[in-house]
Amino acid sequence: MTNIRKTHPLMKIVNNTFIDLPTPSNISSWWNFGSLLGICLILQILTGLFLAMHYTSDTMTAFSSVTHICRDVNYGWIIRYMHANGASMFFICLFMHIGRGLYYGSYTFLETWNIGVILLLATMATAFMGYVLPWGQMSFWGATVITNLLSAIPYIGTNLVEWIWGGFSVDKATLTRFFAFHFILPFIITALAMVHLLFLHETGSNNPTGIPSDTDKIPFHPYYTIKDILGAMLLILVLMLLVLFTPDLLGDPDNYIPANPLNTPPHIKPEWYFLFAYAILRSIPNKLGGVLALVLSILILVLVPFLHTSKQRSMMFRPISQCMFWILVADLLTLTWIGGQPVEHPYIIIGQLASIMYFLIILVMMPAASTIENNLLKW
């Protein structure tokens, strides 16, 4: 009798995705982040669901409802902080996952890569709207500043902003719709993640060497299920250390002050995972130019597969490209630091130089390094 795992229509899908999936035998821990992102997503949906049971999306009661969750709801504080810090863990895993894709040339799977970029944009939108919901000072002013950027779009900008606000300023209508979108988007992300996996399993996984591994495949279970469980345990360990010891480490103290449209905080800044993009936005003195740079800083990922000039897929055997990659990582860390600093000398010039470097490395230096390596190998 054939195993039900291989015959049942639903079980067959699960089997071909998580059990009998042929997997390269040499993939490293950098390939763990896909499953960790899945765990983060499930965790965020579950904690978010329980928070939504007690949250009210009204400007008069939103701040109080979050306080009520932390003070009066059974284990409300842990659910709230798991959700807030879970977002940080989500983005850490996302950045690692994208970095892995860039380093090992996984972006040559075009469909998988492009769905991944859409997933990144959807996750960023979800996180931004979630940050608005507690209705603290940084929530209100963050929403005001970021939505206002759309007014830089010629001709339709102002109308577009007022349409998104649902009025002439960030108010009750804005908060209500942000809550609605924040609730629905994770389910859209889940559907997109399934499409992401579908496209990945059409080609099979890449591996650190970038060389096709069809001759050397092993079943996903038990080899990589056990490896993923170890990764998940480490993820939950780090998350719970954050939640239980320093829950507000990555937050902004200004968000414990209720939103006040008459009082602007001294330094408006987003959550840490948006600071690199915020620094690029601020580095251009022109409003429309800044908005374009901000959008391009993310959409540049779509161009990466077309900028691949190397005869090799992975950077494993390409030392010059490796140097470029790690300079890019250092540059992104610099941008993240600058994004959290006030707009004054010397931070302005550092931010501008780091922004120029970011685009220069991806568009010019990396393809050039690949061409040099090809010539050195006489290819």
Swiss-Prot record:
Positions contributing to heme b b562 binding: H83, H182
Cofactor comment text: Binds 2 heme b groups non-covalently.
Cofactor(s) for this UniProt protein: heme b
Gene3D superfamilies attached to this UniProt entry: Cytochrome Bc1 Complex, Chain C
Protein's membrane topology: Multi-pass membrane protein
A molecular-function term among this protein's GO annotations: ubiquinol-cytochrome-c reductase activity
Subcellular location, record wording: Mitochondrion inner membrane
GO CC annotation, single: mitochondrial inner membrane
Keyword annotations from UniProtKB, A to Z: Electron transport, Heme, Iron, Membrane, Metal-binding, Mitochondrion, Mitochondrion inner membrane, Respiratory chain, Transmembrane, Transmembrane helix, Transport, Ubiquinone
Oligomer status and interactors: The cytochrome bc1 complex contains 11 subunits: 3 respiratory subunits (MT-CYB, CYC1 and UQCRFS1), 2 core proteins (UQCRC1 and UQCRC2) and 6 low-molecular weight proteins (UQCRH/QCR6, UQCRB/QCR7, UQCRQ/QCR8, UQCR10/QCR9, UQCR11/QCR10 and a cleavage product of UQCRFS1). This cytochrome bc1 complex then forms a dimer.
PANTHER family in alphabetical order: CYTOCHROME B
Name of this protein: Cytochrome b
Organismal lineage: Eukaryota, Metazoa, Chordata, Craniata, Vertebrata
